[in-house]
Amino acid sequence: MKRNDKSGNSAPGVKKEKVVIGKLLIIGITYYKHDGTFIERKQLYGKVTNVYKDSIAVELEGTNAGTIFYIPRNLRALLKASPGIYELKSTGELVTNPDYTTMWNVTKPPPD
């Protein structure tokens, strides 16, 4: 039985949270000030190590190797990546054939 069909969806009876463990993920994060002003854009990559009730744990590779990074548990935000070499604009690193990509916007709270 195939684990994934061509659309990237899990095969019948296989939960997506199980399928993504061990998969290579590129994470894009854009940070904004509380007023919507752009701060910075970061890109990270690594392998999914666990899917928790509220988060997904990713063991980062490359310049951030060894760090565990958590993203919200929204499996719909994990998009099947097309095969190829991806260049991370923020670091210049090359990632070959990632399994998934995901993008997040983070708005910082106003200062106290």
Placement of each model-derived feature along the sequence:
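Short beta-rich binding modules
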Residues: 1-112
